[in-house]
Amino acid sequence: EIGVRLVGSEMCIRDRYKPDFAVVAVKKDAICDVSMEWLDRGITVLSETPAALDMDSLNKLYSYYKCGKKQVVAEQYREYPNIKASLKLINEGIIGDVSCANVSLAHEYHGISLIRAFLGVKPGEKYVVSAKTYEFPTTQTLTRYDKFTDGRIAGKKRCVATFEFESGKVAWYDFDSEQYRSPIRKNTLKVQGVRGELIDECVYYLDENNDCLL
């Protein structure tokens, strides 16, 4: 009806249409297994994050890479316009060499991806992490499915973690379970460099005369 070809099996796709790559768009606990099924068929895979949920699964995926098979994992947060603009300023050196960042923008693997981007962490760089999850009473407002206006209060989790990288750079991850949708829990970002800092959408830095600019 709309010109999209449908098939009844993965084997039919491979043998009849010989795709350039397969897009894996399934629940996150199935991404790894489905990706490996297509890699086993010799098909390049494009998947979203997370590629896997544990180290054993990640190591299995890495073994495919070492054999020359390819999986591309799409991470979208670095491409958000405001984040992309912030990264551009930092990479241009406006605040100098970056030493630390406080990232409260996105959960788990998305947040860690942003930490690596803002600090310029090298692939494979070792780090030490310590973390703790707290629970605080919070007035409920919006969820993915509902809107609450009766003032109900529930315990909501907040995870705080410190990442210390072997380069000496440090990041603090801070994320509240209500943060994506609640109007009373807002995102925030702070990145410090030797010549200034970026806080949300403001940059404080020194010019060539070492005068402070905003």
Residue positions per predicted region:
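Single conserved hydrophobic/aromatic residue that forms the stacking wall/gate
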Residues: 1-8, 12-13
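Beta-strand-loop-alpha-helix segment that lines the small-molecule cofactor/substrate pocket
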Residues: 12, 19-21, 27-79
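Glycine-rich phosphate-binding loop signature in dinucleotide/nucleotide-binding domains
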Residues: 15-18, 94-95
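Short glycine-/small-residue-rich Rossmann-like dinucleotide-binding loops
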Residues: 26-27, 175
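Rossmann-like NAD(P)H-binding beta-loop-alpha module
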Residues: 81-99
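Rossmann-like dinucleotide-binding domain that binds NAD(P)(H)
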Residues: 97-186
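NAD(P)-dinucleotide binding in Rossmann-like oxidoreductases
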Residues: 167-214
